[in-house]
A protein has these predicted regions:
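Short acidic/histidine-rich active-site segments
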Residues: 324-329, 333-335
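Carbohydrate-binding surfaces of carbohydrate-active enzymes
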Residues: 295, 351-352
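Substrate-binding/active-site clefts of carbohydrate-active enzymes
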Residues: 1-114, 118-147, 152, 163-164, ...
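Conserved alpha/beta catalytic core and glycan-binding cleft of carbohydrate-active enzymes
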Residues: 113, 128, 134-325, 340
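Acyl/amide activation-and-transfer machinery of modular secondary-metabolite enzymes
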Residues: 340-351
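Residue-level signal for pocket-adjacent positions within structured domains
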Residues: 1, 67, 78, 85, ...
Length: 353
């Protein structure tokens, strides 16, 4: 929870646990972890150490702001700085912030027994006054902490600040979400085909780019040459690339094959939110086709073929594949590519489909 780094998000617990209180919610999480382990699953916890629920300078004082605003939050002569797009950016230069993050990580490993962490907007954790540093004290502390030596560390390697895109630049043993894999696979199987059908000309995708992603994205994950190693070598194995085509943000796989424009009207922002760079292809019709529509079977068959091709590319590429829940079942968000605010059928997984 961005309210407290030592508590799970209570809204994800059962109604009974929520009613019983915070300890019941925590016990439910511990039970979940034990049962997943018993079934052979590891548990990766999504953590948000780049900002808190207190938001920007005009946000509420709920925890850290009331304790020591200038020590915990990134400010410039008292003015809040924001590289996350949410306000309330924590200051990774601060010793108190580093202690807080490390204590939280140790707690989840030692008390709840999670197997690893996915760090939201992880570039923020490696920033100082000059920008991002792979040898930032906080990142070094995380990768060298004895309590964390056996856990998996996964970075979302960007934020919205200057120089925020840092894919491939995190220190070992971090793995990283590979946005280039996402973009190039989408371009090859979807956007490029859409361009060819409309203009007859090649699009933005290419065989060379796809081959690079299939081979482990060595163009991005051999940038770090540790002291004493010949130039061009790296300690980072192909698994450091977390390959994905879809995630919690953006189109689902089904929607990549059924929509070319975002349809976020339900979010209440006049469809201004969400990216317009979707690299998708609707195969001849925008959105779902009603029963009996002309060419419906032909279009649906083409969409399924493309989805299978994308999934095969993801699963067979060198690296660590990440599959968004529901993509294997054709889950749709009805063209909404920014469904974070939709706690309804738009974002739910329909297990009956």
């Amino acid at each position: 929870s961005t309210m407290s780094y030592f508590a799970p998000e209570p809204s994800l617990a059962t109604a009974a646990a929520q009613q019983a209180g915070a300890q019941a919610v925590l016990e439910e999480v511990k039970t979940m972890v034990r049962r997943l382990h018993a079934a052979g699953f590891e548990v990766i916890l999504d953590v948000v150490y780049n900002h808190t629920a207190e938001g920007g300078g005009d946000g509420p004082s709920l925890s850290l702001r009331g304790l020591d605003n200038l020590e915990y939050y990134w400010t410039d002569h008292g003015v809040p700085q924001d590289v996350t797009g949410t306000g309330g950016t924590l200051d990774p230069r601060s010793v108190h912030t580093m202690d807080l993050v490390l204590a939280s990580l140790r707690y989840w490993v030692q008390e709840v027994h999670v197997d690893g962490f996915r760090f939201d907007l992880a570039t923020t954790l490696g920033r100082d006054d000059r920008g991002f540093r792979a040898d930032h004290p906080l990142l070094r502390a995380i990768v060298t902490d004895p309590a964390l030596r056996d856990v998996k560390l996964i970075a979302e390697p960007w934020d919205v600040g200057t120089g925020g895109w840092q894919t491939g630049n995190f220190p070992a043993p971090f793995a990283e979400w590979n946005d280039a894999f996402r973009d190039d696979v989408r371009a090859f199987w979807l956007a490029d085909r859409a361009a060819r059908e409309r203009t007859g000309e090649p699009g933005i995708g290419g065989v060379r780019d796809l081959a690079t992603r299939l081979a482990g994205s060595s163009d991005m994950f051999t940038r770090q040459d540790p002291p004493g190693l010949p130039e061009g070598r790296s300690l980072r194995a192909p698994w450091a690339s977390i390959n994905y085509v879809t995630a919690h943000d953006g189109f689902t796989l089904r929607d990549l094959t059924a929509y070319e424009s975002k349809h976020n009207e339900a979010n209440g922002e006049d469809n201004r939110d969400g990216t317009s760079d979707n690299r998708s292809f609707h195969h001849g019709h925008e959105g779902e086709l009603p029963p009996g529509a002309p060419h419906r079977e032909e279009i649906e068959a083409a969409r399924r073929r493309t989805a299978r091709s994308v999934l095969a590319t993801l699963l067979l590429a060198s690296g660590t594949p990440m599959l968004t829940a529901g993509d294997e079942r054709g889950r749709t968000q009805r063209g909404n590519n920014n469904a974070y605010c939709q706690d309804n059928e738009i974002s739910w997984v329909d297990w009956r489909r």
